[in-house]
Design a protein with these regions (language model features):
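Active-site clefts of carbohydrate-active enzymes
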Residues: 117-120, 144-172, 195-203
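Aromatic- and acid-rich polysaccharide-binding/catalytic face
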Residues: 55, 61, 94-132, 155-156
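Alpha-helical scaffolding within the catalytic cores
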Residues: 9-13, 37-47, 94-107, 133-137, ...
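Catalytic domains of carbohydrate-active enzymes, especially glycoside hydrolases
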Residues: 1-10
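Conserved, mostly hydrophobic/aromatic
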Residues: 2, 57, 112, 150-152, ...
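Aromatic-lined carbohydrate-recognition surfaces of secreted/lumenal glycan-active proteins
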Residues: 29, 81-100, 146-153, 188-200
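Substrate-binding cleft of extracellular glycoside hydrolase catalytic domains
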Residues: 12-91
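Aromatic-rich peripheral "rim/lid" segments of glycoside hydrolase catalytic domains that contact
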Residues: 161-168, 182-224
Length: 224
């Protein structure tokens, strides 16, 4: 599996290429404050799904967390997508705790997609895997029996500390290993964030935002 975060600006090609290599894609429809752009994204996501190139259609990512749209607006996009592609699982991505607060979103989604970041909750690295597992259990408790997928989790290898959460290569690789050992044992599906470092993200998250990848921005594996 791979995951995308948009269906425009060339991102609509990624699921096609992934399919050629035998990979499924969780196709992300980017939603925000620009309603006209949302319509373009949704139409492109639906087209990708109808072409058989979406294993899951994820309509929106952390939209409530950012405060870009209301719950009712997000539900409208989700329901329109479900009507357009009835054979494809349709869902919405956000922080795990928001599914506790918005049960109508749980009802509208075919699967529950949760982002789990102990780092951004100032959790010390040694306790982070256990805290991530607790996030998952909390989402499971309100999922009404639906499949819960961790759509994002990770730990940065460099940058400034966030409270008691300290970046570093050792902390990052330990988090990765413990996360995947647990996921394999418990049969939990995870999209790890992320494949590559992204230098452009420093504007939003400070210097730590650039260093969440397993590979650096030049494609070199960081943990060898």
């Amino acid at each position: 599996w791979i995951r995308t975060f948009s269906c425009t600006d060339g991102n609509e090609r990624s699921p096609v290429v992934a399919r050629e290599f035998g990979l499924d894609t969780m196709v992300g429809v980017c939603l925000g404050e620009d309603h006209a752009m949302n319509e373009i994204e949704l139409a492109s996501g639906i087209a990708i799904a109808r072409a058989g190139n979406a294993g899951i259609l994820a309509v929106g990512n952390e939209v409530l967390l950012r405060g870009d749209l209301s719950e009712d607006e997000i539900l409208d996009y989700i329901l329109r997508a479900r009507e357009a592609v009835p054979g494809v699982p349709v869902a919405y991505v956000d922080a795990y705790f928001l599914f506790e607060q918005y049960p109508r979103l749980v009802e509208a989604c075919d699967v529950i997609l949760i982002n789990c970041y102990p780092f951004w909750e100032s959790c010390p690295a040694e306790y982070a895997p256990a805290y991530m597992r607790e996030m998952y259990r909390r989402a499971q408790a309100v999922a009404n029996g639906k499949r819960v997928i961790i759509s994002e989790t990770g730990w940065p290898s460099r940058g400034e500390a966030y409270g008691e959460a300290v970046p570093g290569k050792e902390n990052a690789i330990n988090y990765f290993i413990e996360t995947y050992l647990w996921a394999q044992k418990e049969d939990v599906d995870i999209f790890y964030f992320s494949s590559f470092d992204e230098s452009w993200k420093t504007g939003d998250e400070g210097d730590v935002g650039a260093y969440w990848g397993l590979w650096d921005e030049h494609g070199k594996m960081k943990y060898v």
